[in-house]
Amino acid sequence: MKSLVLLLCFAQLWGCQSAPQGTGLGFRELACDDPEAEQVALLAVDYLNNHLLQGFKQVLNQIDKVKVWSRRPFGVVYEMEVDTLETTCHALDPTPLANCSVRQLTEHAVEGDCDFHILKQDGQFRVMHTQCHSTPDSAEDVRKLCPRCPLLTPFNDTNVVHTVNTALAAFNTQNNGTYFKLVEISRAQNVPLPVSTLVEFVIAATDCTAKEVTDPAKCNLLAEKQHGFCKANLMHNLGGEEVSVACKLFQTQPQPANANAVGPVPTANAALPADPPASVVVGPVVVPRGLSDHRTYHDLRHAFSPVASVESASGETLHSPKVGQPGAAGPVSPMCPGRIRHFKI
């Protein structure tokens, strides 16, 4: 009898520790494809994207689990597990998420797994807790789907570093205004055929002009950060190398006082020989935030900076999606996990 009492006590203690802080012990399970669950999940992903510091924006792929806890004295707390997928839009890109393409499996996709606790009280949502991590698709799965598709390559790979330096030098060469520095290597792949290296990276405007830079270390980033996102390809030909780079500037870049009156255009392309002119100074590749750059992707575990809370009026940040009503006949769908919106990794 004493053993049974002790067992019940331990069960109650475990339940108290598992429940989100401030809730009662009672909860209800909500179907993962319920419009209510989808609305809260979209809000959670929106919160995630608003606080990403590096890497790429995320899109909701699947809701794995939902519990709705009663909160004393008022409100409810949604405890959710969701899967996300990386998009092609960088975290700093102001492009609306709806206009961002999902990174496809053939591009070596990366999946995010997130746990959220979201309070709903008086029609207001507040994110109380967030914990995420990322996992790329396995090389084996990519090879099965597309044997010749390039895989993710470490940021500190020799070809990657060389391509980023060369591409940034090419961009600064054809730019008559602000000198840009590297902020982050976002993605890299070595392509076997034709032999080339693909890179995506973030740049930022400095207080120097591109034509007058002699020591990049003396160029400081502007107080109000002005970022751009670049994609580059370095072809390894028999007769040498050729780089092509295209950069999208997220805002109109202010020019230093002694700069040319004509500033850089929002999108710039360059196709130049790999070796920059002697007058062009290439700064070293930056290793951001002290993380080892044998990484091949930006893990949400490090890229996401959680904030204590973010309040959002229910209907201001997102709208409930149109969810089809179930037919009169047919098998009953399981409550969870929910539907896969794109593809499963």
UniProtKB/Swiss-Prot annotation:
Keywords assigned by UniProt, alphabetized: Disulfide bond, Glycoprotein, Phosphoprotein, Repeat, Secreted, Signal
Position of the signal peptide: 1-18
InterPro entries reported for this sequence: Cystatin_dom (IPR000010), Cystatin_Fetuin_A (IPR025760), Cystatin_sf (IPR046350), Kininogen_Fetuin_HRG (IPR050735), Prot_inh_fetuin_CS (IPR001363)
Location of Phosphothreonine modifications: T135
Glycosylated residues in this chain: N99, N156, N176
Modifications the protein undergoes after translation, according to the UniProt entry: Phosphorylated by FAM20C in the extracellular medium.
Transcription is among the record's keywords: no
Disulfide bonds: C32-C336, C89-C100, C114-C132, C146-C149, C208-C219, C230-C247
Renumbered residue ranges of the record's region Disordered: 312-334
Xref: SMART domains: CY
Modified residues (Phosphoserine): S134, S138, S305, S309, S312, S314
Subcellular location: Secreted
Organ and tissue specificity: Liver is the major site of synthesis, but fetuin is also expressed in limb buds and other extrahepatic tissues during development.
Cited function: Probably involved in differentiation.
UniProt record similarity statement: Belongs to the fetuin family.
UniProt name for this protein: Alpha-2-HS-glycoprotein
